[in-house]
A protein has these predicted regions:
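Acidic/polar residues at beta-strand termini and the immediately following turn/coil
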Residues: 33, 104, 213-217
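Extracytoplasmic/periplasmic, Sec-exported soluble proteins
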Residues: 10-18, 49-57, 84, 114
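Generic solvent-exposed, charged/amphipathic alpha-helical segments
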Residues: 23-27, 62, 193-196, 200
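Hydrophobic/aromatic-rich core segments of domains that either
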Residues: 56-128
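Conserved active-site-adjacent core of cysteine acyl-enzyme catalytic domains
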Residues: 37-52, 56-63
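Intrinsically disordered, low-complexity coil segments
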Residues: 8-9, 48, 78-87, 232
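Secondary-structure boundary elements
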Residues: 1-46
Length: 238
């Protein structure tokens, strides 16, 4: 079957590698279905038709995790019309190296663009995920650890403005996209302004412009640098 064929590509990887294989497969091959067709709520939508909503994606992630020997369940949260959240939302809780984490491939799917795969929602603790997810309807295991949080593992979770400045300088010089997680306390408006100043100063020094996207609840920033000077762009990601 397609699932077995897919799983075969990842069976030699370690547990974290298998998890990332599943995440990246979803991000690269499944389109979020804004029309919400019936099959988009099922595994066939994600794995058969390449389109799905959160429920279909979460079910597909669970199926692939089952196939690759990763403990996984589907988590479900209630809608909250007062906050403008019209629908329930589904994602996954996985167990990696014996520890429980939240994994939301749907949210990363909608954030990933320009060939940049996003990992903002890979291996989050409760206190991170519930910044922008409603409480779960059915109990899931407590996720209290963030040692396997993707950006932390990859050492792109930074705590000082100086570190951000050094990395920004390198990114401008090499013409690379800068993608990182801010861990130096809360990402307040004041901190964000300080970081924006850094991006713009370093870009301007090389006659470039900084285009910044911010996932505010998760404190993840993505910065592109382009030639020329003009309007700086700041986008709040949803």
């Amino acid at each position: 079957s397609r699932v077995k064929k897919l799983a075969r590509q990842a069976e030699k990887l370690d547990e974290k590698g298998r998890e990332l294989f599943i995440h990246d497969f979803i991000v690269n091959n499944v389109k979020y279905d804004k029309l919400k067709k019936e099959y988009s709520h099922e595994i066939i939508g994600a794995l058969g038709n390449g389109v799905a909503v959160c429920e279909g994606i979460a079910k597909a992630v669970k199926l692939l995790c089952d196939e690759l020997g990763i403990w996984c369940i589907v988590a479900l949260s209630e809608a909250n019309p007062e906050k403008g959240i019209k629908y329930r939302h589904a994602w996954n809780v996985v167990r990696i190296d014996g520890t429980y984490y939240h994994l939301d491939a749907t949210f990363d799917n909608t954030l990933s663009k320009d060939d940049t795969i996003r990992y903002d929602y890979v291996n989050l603790a409760d206190k991170q995920i519930f910044r922008d997810h409603e409480p779960v309807i059915w109990k899931v295991p407590a996720c209290t650890d963030n040692d396997h949080f993707y950006y932390r593992v990859k050492k792109v979770s930074w705590t000082t403005v100086d570190e951000v400045r050094n990395r920004t300088r390198q990114a401008v010089k090499k013409n690379k996209i800068l993608l990182f997680h801010w861990r130096g306390g809360y990402l307040t408006k004041e901190v964000l302004k300080e970081l924006l100043d850094v991006f713009h100063e370093e870009a301007k020094a090389k006659e470039k412009q900084a285009y910044v996207s911010v996932n505010w609840p998760q404190a993840v920033l993505r910065v592109r640098f382009k030639e020329g000077v003009g309007e700086e762009l700041l986008e709040m990601e949803e």
